[in-house]
Amino acid sequence: MSLRSVLVAALAALAVATPVPENSLQERQLMSSNDVEDGVCRDVTFIFARGSTEQGNMGFVVGPEVCTSLKADLGSGKVACQGVGGAYTASLAPNFLSANTDPQSIQAATDLFEKAVANCPNTQIVAGGYSQGSAVMDNSIQALPADIQEKVKGVVLFGFTRNLQDNGQIPNYPKEDVKVYCALGDLVCSGTLIITPAHMTYGVNAGDAAQFLASKVQ
């Protein structure tokens, strides 16, 4: 069996083993947020890309918790939240590409940044990504046009799959505006795609991440 096959099996096994909320309509809604798609304008817009195999467009490991914490910090009426969906299906195979995701997933994130700025020109954007979603955000943000990128005030990355390759930062984006969370024992942050239980622990960082993002827009 090839190393790639072993890693795919490990990712799939972990996805099956990870507890997922029951498939009720209410719980699925908690894993999705579509404020940008729905044309909602707030002072702050949070755009998040979930990890591989996560349900909804926000996932369940950390995305919804950051959104909730950010609303608690800034006021629920001041924050819009949007998950990256559409062409970003969070499937496993794109992790093995050179960008650790695929072009259509990167474009899905870029489209949301562009839509947020076009529809809500006064909003301040903050962003986040987990696992494959961190690669989606990394690749999208570094290539944004300057007038759109300057609207992105802060980014949080959890289990950053390109942490080693990109030196713990997003190329062509201010390092001080990025906070990377890499749990002890998460081998993904060491340049591998080997999934360990540590990779699923980033919910504990949601509050701190929200505080970091809030500090960038206050």
Swiss-Prot record:
ATP-binding among keywords: no
| Sorted UniProt keywords | Disulfide bond, Hydrolase, Secreted, Serine esterase, Signal
Sorted alphabetically, the Gene Ontology cellular component annotations on this record are: extracellular region
Q: Residues at site: Transition state stabilizer?
A: S52, Q132
Pfam families, per the entry: Cutinase (PF01083)
Q: Name one GO molecular function term.
A: cutinase activity
State where the protein is found: Secreted
- Provide the catalytic activity annotation: cutin + H2O = cutin monomers
Which GO biological-process labels does this protein carry?
Answer: carbohydrate catabolic process
Q: What is its main location?
A: secreted
SMART domains the UniProt entry points to: Cutinase
Annotated signal sequence is 1-17
Superkingdom, natural source = Eukaryota
Active site per database record: S131 (nucleophile), D186, H199 (proton donor/acceptor)
Q: What EC number(s) does this enzyme carry?
A: 3.1.1.74
Intrachain disulfide bonds: C41-C120, C67-C81, C182-C189
- Give a yes or no for keyword Secreted in this entry: yes
Family, as annotated: Belongs to the cutinase family.
Role: Catalyzes the hydrolysis of complex carboxylic polyesters found in the cell wall of plants. Degrades cutin, a macromolecule that forms the structure of the plant cuticle.
User: Which PANTHER family would you find in this protein's record?
Assistant: CUTINASE 1-RELATED, CUTINASE 2-RELATED
Protein known as: Probable cutinase 3
